[in-house]
Every structure is written in structure tokens, then in C-alpha cells.
């Protein structure tokens, strides 16, 4: 009799409906709901849910910025985001001077003796050694890359050294294992910024001439992009991922006027028949809205993203964040003191944890990323769980995607 009564009081929701409900919830709630039950956690960490949630969040892009740099604390997310104009900023406690690379909402920060891979959305940090054994040569002589293998979905770190020693390696974040790479066809200068676009990492080399070196993360093969869009590529030219296309941002002068030009690359063909073409996406006059004192002041600009209306968000090397309104041809300064790291999209894919990995959770006990069991949901079938079910069902009915 008691068993019957208990069964009639229980609430069951099919996993497919639960997944649709979870898709509508804010990140903070999703992180808490992972602690309710193994079933909920498996749903929230499933590949299908992560992909569906990621597709929704592509339309809710934010900016990741460094905040209150602290050399003695591990990186941690600021509890609440802020707004500059109508743009949402997510702040990360970290040393902005440390080299960093981003891909799909994940962040790779290098420090002496370690690669730190962070997932700010899931509140996870993994640390990896810089090689399979003792690493030769100083870090300043490394050429680094970080990105996602489009075939396997795995994130990888690339490390190359062309000075003092010749070492070329790739780290699979999934396994934590370093493998050897064959040497690229061109010697590259250390410190060149890398960009990951559609499963390939790109580096811009500027010396006597210029070339873009591309590496396919799945095939571990190299390609050279020799035909660049213009002859005025300089040390200030920035290579970026803009709307899932490789893009170059450069400043040129037409008479007394300075112009920010952004060129985007298209790939034609495959394998040995692969070809590259460039098209000009933006040509923006910097006469109004951006202060200059050329030639004494070196200035370069990095695009962040393009809105649905075609407005461009970009920042410079003097901690200024700008927004260009294409409809009115107007530039507005959103912030004059911000250390932009990159664009930021939510990524719920958990970082793999192997016995060889060093593991940390971001934040502290007061952080929204605390991963201890949430005491709001102590047992399945409790009255609190039933209230929770009722609440999320109400949200499912009332809140649109």
C-alpha cells in the first residue's frame, strides 16, 4: 500500500522532454541541476545536448575580458557579467600579459611549465605539461596553436620550436598525451598569434615577406596561403576568426584619412587542388570616433564579431572597445579601459579528466561554479525535487526558446 502511494506521488518526465526544458534554462541553473541526479547529469553532458545548446548560444555572444589581474591566484570567473552599452562582458581573473588562445568558448593560457585549459562555462580547468619530457629552449621561442579537430571534436594544443632546438608536438586534450609532429615547410618566427577556423590553425608570418601557414588538426598536414589580399600587410595586421572565416584586419591610409579594412578568406576545392580567395568585408573610415596621433602612436584593431544587423564590434591595443554601425557609418567607443581577450560563447562540453590530468574547479565556495553537491536538492523524490519539477515545467510552457 505504501509502495503504491509512493509511486502515485512520484513524477516522471521522459528524457526528451527534460532535454527540451533544460535548453531554456540559464547557465547557472544548468550547472546546479547537474548535481540533482546521474540521469540529469548524463543528459546535460551528452554530446547531443551540448551541440543543441551551443547552436542556441551562438546567437547570444559575449565578450571575454581580463579583470583585476592577480599573479598568485588561478584563473577564475567573475560571479556576474557586466554591460558596456548593449554588449555583455564576462570577466576572468587572470594575468592579461600571459599568452592566451581561444576556441569555441575554451581558453588556453600558457605559464612557465604549464598549459592551462579553461572552460569558463563549466567552471573547469585542466593543466598539462608543455611536452612529453623535459622541454628544451625558452618559452619565448615557441610557436603555439590551440583549436578543435572538426572530425573527432577533440581540442588540441600545438607547440613548435624553430630556435635553439627543433621540436614539433601536438597535445590531445582528451587523452593528455603528446605526439610528435613533422616539421612544417616554412620556418616561422616565435610568438605569432594563432587562429583556429573550421578545424585548422593559422599563423601569419611577417618578415622579409609574408605568408600564412595553415595546419589541419585532424590530418596534421600543412598548407601555405601565399596569395594575401593586399601588399600593405604589416606587423600591426591582425589575423582573426570572424563569422567562421579566416579574416585579416589592417589599417591603410588614403591621403590624410586612415581606413580599417577587413578581408575574409574563402577556401575552394580540397587536398592538393585547394585554393584560396579573399573578399573585402569592411572598409571603415577611422576619422570620427577613433583618435589618432600617427605616426608616433602605433595602433592596431582586432575584430570580435558581426551582429545580425551587420554592425562590427572591434577593439584596439590601447584597451578601447568600439562598435561600428554599418547603417549610419558611425563608430562609438563602448569602453576606454577594457582588456579584451576574445569573443565568448557558452560551451557546456566537460573537459575530460584522466588520471594523468591536473584538475581544478574555477572559483571558490562562493562562486557560481562550485561543483560540490547542491544541498538544495538532497534526495530524489523529496518535496524540493517536486517543486523543482513543477517550476521547470512552468518555465517550459511559458518561456520561448
UniProtKB/Swiss-Prot annotation:
Q: Which residues form the F-box domain?
A: 7-53
Q: Which domain of life is it from?
A: Eukaryota
Question: Which NCBIfam families did the record assign?
Answer: F_box_assoc_1 (TIGR01640)
Cited PANTHER family? BNACNNG10540D PROTEIN, F-BOX PROTEIN CPR30-LIKE
Protein name (database record): F-box protein At2g43440
Q: Name one Pfam family in it.
A: FBA_1
Listed as disulfide-bonded, the cysteine pairs are none
Which InterPro entries does the entry link to?
F-box-assoc_dom_typ1 (IPR006527), F-box-assoc_interact_dom (IPR017451), F-box-like_dom_sf (IPR036047), F-box_dom (IPR001810), SCF_F-box_component (IPR050796)
Amino acid at each position: 500500500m505504501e509502495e503504491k502511494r509512493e509511486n502515485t506521488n512520484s513524477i516522471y518526465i521522459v528524457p526528451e522532454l527534460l532535454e527540451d526544458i533544460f535548453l531554456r534554462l540559464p547557465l547557472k541553473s544548468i550547472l546546479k541541476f547537474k548535481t540533482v541526479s546521474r540521469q540529469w547529469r548524463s543528459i546535460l553532458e551528452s554530446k547531443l545536448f551540448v551541440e543543441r545548446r551551443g547552436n542556441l548560444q551562438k546567437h547570444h555572444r559575449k565578450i571575454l575580458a581580463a579583470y583585476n589581474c592577480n599573479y598568485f591566484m588561478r584563473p577564475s570567473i567573475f560571479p556576474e557579467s557586466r554591460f558596456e552599452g548593449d554588449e555583455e562582458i564576462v570577466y576572468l581573473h587572470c594575468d592579461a600579459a600571459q599568452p592566451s588562445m581561444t576556441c569555441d568558448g575554451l581558453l588556453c593560457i600558457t605559464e612557465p611549465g604549464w598549459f592551462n585549459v579553461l572552460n569558463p562555462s563549466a567552471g573547469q580547468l585542466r593543466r598539462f605539461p608543455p611536452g612529453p619530457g623535459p622541454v628544451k629552449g625558452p618559452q619565448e621561442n615557441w610557436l603555439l596553436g590551440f583549436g578543435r579537430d572538426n572530425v573527432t571534436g577533440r581540442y588540441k594544443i600545438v607547440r613548435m620550436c624553430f630556435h635553439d632546438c627543433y621540436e614539433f608536438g601536438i597535445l590531445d586534450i582528451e587523452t593528455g598525451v603528446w605526439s610528435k609532429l613533422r616539421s612544417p615547410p616554412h620556418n616561422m618566427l616565435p610568438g605569432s598569434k594563432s587562429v583556429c577556423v573550421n578545424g585548422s590553425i593559422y599563423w601569419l608570418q611577417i618578415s622579409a615577406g609574408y605568408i600564412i601557414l595553415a595546419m589541419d588538426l585532424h590530418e596534421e598536414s600543412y598548407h601555405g596561403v601565399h596569395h594575401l589580399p593586399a601588399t600593405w600587410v604589416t606587423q600591426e595586421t591582425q589575423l582573426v576568426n570572424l563569422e567562421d572565416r579566416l579574416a585579416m584586419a589592417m589599417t591603410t591610409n588614403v591621403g590624410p584619412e586612415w581606413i580599417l579594412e577587413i578581408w575574409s578568406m574563402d577556401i575552394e576545392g580540397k587536398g592538393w587542388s585547394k585554393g584560396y580567395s579573399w573578399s573585402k568585408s569592411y572598409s571603415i573610415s577611422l576619422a570620427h570616433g577613433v583618435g589618432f596621433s600617427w605616426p608616433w602612436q602605433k595602433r592596431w584593431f582586432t575584430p570580435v564579431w558581426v551582429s545580425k544587423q551587420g554592425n562590427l564590434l572591434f577593439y584596439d591595443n590601447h584597451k578601447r572597445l568600439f562598435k561600428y554601425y554599418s547603417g549610419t557609418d558611425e563608430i562609438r567607443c563602448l569602453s576606454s579601459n577594457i582588456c579584451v581577450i576574445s569573443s565568448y560563447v557558452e560551451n557546456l562540453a566537460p573537459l575530460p579528466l584522466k588520471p594523468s590530468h591536473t584538475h581544478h574547479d574555477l572559483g571558490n565556495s562562493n562562486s557560481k561554479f562550485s561543483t560540490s553537491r547542491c544541498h538544495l536538492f538532497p534526495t530524489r523524490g523529496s518535496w524540493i525535487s517536486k517543486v523543482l519539477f513543477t517550476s521547470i515545467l512552468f518555465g517550459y510552457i511559458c518561456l520561448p526558446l
